[in-house]
């Protein structure tokens, strides 16, 4: 059994080298879901294997999809809606915000009640704006507690138009996916859309699957009664995961470059824009057709709109500690409602390491700082954990003990192996468990 407070021990080092970035979590989850909604058998190569993808696979099986894995390939025989029979009427969403939002919306197509639950940590992920829109379309929602899980949803929804909050792009993506396969016309308008690149990623998928819809600014219309044909797809590398390895190389005292492969330059992932931002701030980054080369270099801070790559807030906060001048990260209010309150969490932990990091309502103000080793905590958030690991590698002195690191499996299960391949001194902590428990409280 994996200990609940698994830890990393990190020492200052000078990373460099080459690594092929693991599959994108966002693409993997969408590929699994769309294949499960399709007619026929779809083939998905190089899907990420993680707790979130396991949650999506389990839920899609309950919706009637038949899924087998052959090596690194998934074979998915879809079961398009309308849904009438299930292997279970209880859907456990684990700790996956995407599974919670996307599958809740799809459950609104069912005439039978479905119980939606999840890990206790999922209760911090807002769902009320989506539930409200589904109720307006005719869904019955029962057993709501504090606007979160658990709840029971029963459809089917009817044709209509709703307005959905854009504070989290997953609400709009969930409605778009549901409208794409609904039997009746559906339309919706998005109010103040945030994280726009991630909503555009969903629309890019719908275009590739030949789903028809019209769009006027942030209002969309779906004609209904459409179907998804089976497809073959190879999942590209994850730009969000690549950001952590890129930061290892960018801040390195080595004279050697870091080269990251499996990153198609034309892929629409939102966090891809982070690399262009760093380049504009002076970082020595070369973006090629299928890889990115990062050379150790200095770069400026700045006033940075985080909305296009809000998930990169933790690692960008670390990078800004090493910038030549202060930085102000703003327009990241949604970062407070991720796996942790990322604004408060990363500020709190970096201050333990000597960082001058100050939370604002929607972001951070960061002054250049010399970091030192410390005992820090992941807040059970994979992106906080990996950002702090990078900070520990580039601390000016002392080791860093990073606690509760099992959360890294959510998006980058082999993060330590990747870091070690790049000559970063990060290892699973092997000290006495009782001592580790005391330190990691």
Swiss-Prot record:
Keyword Transferase found: yes
Reaction(s) catalysed by this chain, per the record, are: 3-phosphoshikimate + phosphoenolpyruvate = 5-O-(1-carboxyvinyl)-3-phosphoshikimate + phosphate
Task: From the record, give the transmembrane residue ranges.
Answer: none
Molecular function terms from GO: 3-phosphoshikimate 1-carboxyvinyltransferase activity
Q: Which Pfam families match?
A: EPSP_synthase
Pathway field: Metabolic intermediate biosynthesis; chorismate biosynthesis; chorismate from D-erythrose 4-phosphate and phosphoenolpyruvate: step 6/7
The reply on keyword Amino-acid biosynthesis is yes
The record's listing under PANTHER family reads: AROM/DEHYDROQUINATE SYNTHASE, PENTAFUNCTIONAL AROM POLYPEPTIDE
* Name by which UniProt lists this protein: 3-phosphoshikimate 1-carboxyvinyltransferase
To which species is this protein native?
A: Chlamydia muridarum (strain MoPn / Nigg)
Task: List the lineage, top down.
Answer: Bacteria, Pseudomonadati, Chlamydiota, Chlamydiia, Chlamydiales
In the UniProt record, the gene name given for this protein reads: aroA
